[in-house]
């Protein structure tokens, strides 16, 4: 495969298997670099990036946590009434909700830590949740945008479920901007 462009960028999850990682490296003719979006935002999103763009890997890491991207006045519709169990405010996942669902969807995040990777979710109880003043609530679409370092309301104009999915499928803007700096 020959690429005649000035630069290319390919991304995949850091949890991918070694066989796939090597296959991509062989196809693209370069090894991946590892960057976690948590170095640039309040979201842990470990990824491999393959690129022919020289990337500075010695950079100042962001100390931003979930609390820094939260809205101050959130509509009551985002709050849950399910009982909380295992509350421990010293942990990143500081509580779980008592309802039927996959364990990942029961997790309540401490706002003083970074949140785990955003995933595609269309609604229901699948959005990331935060513990605020003794209550659990789902993150808002605006907060999802902020975790991806998008401008506020960038995904506005479509249903909330689509906004969550778009953010879960997207790249973290500040990571991509950092990678592309060398092209400026």
Task: For every predicted segment, state its role.
Residues 1-6, 15, 20-184:
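S-adenosyl-L-methionine-dependent DNA methyltransferase catalytic core
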Residues 11-12:
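Walker B catalytic acidic pair
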């Amino acid at each position: 495969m020959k690429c005649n462009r000035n630069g290319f960028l390919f991304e995949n999850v850091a949890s991918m298997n070694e066989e796939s990682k090597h296959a991509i490296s062989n196809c693209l003719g370069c090894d991946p670099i590892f960057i976690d979006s948590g170095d640039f935002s309040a979201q842990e999103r470990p990824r491999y990036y393959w690129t022919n763009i020289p990337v500075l890997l010695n950079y100042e890491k962001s100390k931003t946590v979930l609390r820094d991207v939260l809205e101050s006045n959130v509509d009551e519709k985002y709050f849950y009434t399910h009982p909380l169990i295992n509350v421990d405010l010293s942990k990143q996942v500081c509580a779980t909700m008592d309802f039927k669902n996959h364990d990942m969807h029961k997790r309540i995040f401490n706002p003083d830590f970074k949140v785990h990777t955003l995933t595609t979710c269309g609604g229901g109880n699948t959005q990331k949740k935060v513990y605020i003043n003794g209550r659990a609530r789902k993150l808002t679409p605006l907060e999802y945008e902020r975790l991806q370092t998008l401008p506020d309301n960038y995904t506005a104009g479509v249903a909330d479920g689509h906004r969550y999915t778009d953010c879960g499928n997207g790249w973290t803007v500040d990571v991509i901007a950092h990678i592309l700096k060398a092209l400026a």
